[in-house]
């Protein structure tokens, strides 16, 4: 990645590093500069903005977060569209959250730019509950780091084990001297 100042016309394709407010113009951090943004910047009298550009071999924070989130997702889990480098994972059904803790540690050990956080293992969850998040700290990472995190996930680092109704029986033995109220 390369950071640096640019005129609005030179900024096309770059991503804003900071939120920019100039009069009625507001460009949020992470906005990709296109022709419409250049026109708005010029109208607002902005001469220079700081942008980041991905280099050959880099992937954007959203692409990386989405890829890693898909890799960790197992049965009973859905992934929200990645935004600002974050992909949130949700329970698609009620059940118990089962996590491969070693896979979580492997993913987090790939690089400090990649973070994977989950609820505690074996926690009961309900449908729609957020159970984990993948977050990329910088605006992008090298594709090889994303690929290493995907590989570290294995074949789904987490899943929701559904609740299953089972039949049970009770065998009760009456012993001499046992009070009847204990059995009732």
Q: Where are the language model's segments positioned?
A:
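Short, low-complexity N-terminal leaders and the immediately following helix N-cap/first helix
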Residues: 1-84
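Extended, charged alpha/beta regions that create polyanion-binding interfaces
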Residues: 55-163
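Short, mixed-charge, low-aromatic patches
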Residues: 20-28, 143-150, 168-174
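Glycine-rich phosphate/diphosphate-binding loop of Rossmann-like nucleotide-binding domains
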Residues: 154-184
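Short, glycine/charged-enriched secondary-structure capping and boundary segments
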Residues: 41, 147-148, 183-184
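Residues in well-ordered beta-strands of folded domains
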Residues: 21, 50-52, 90, 132-134, ...
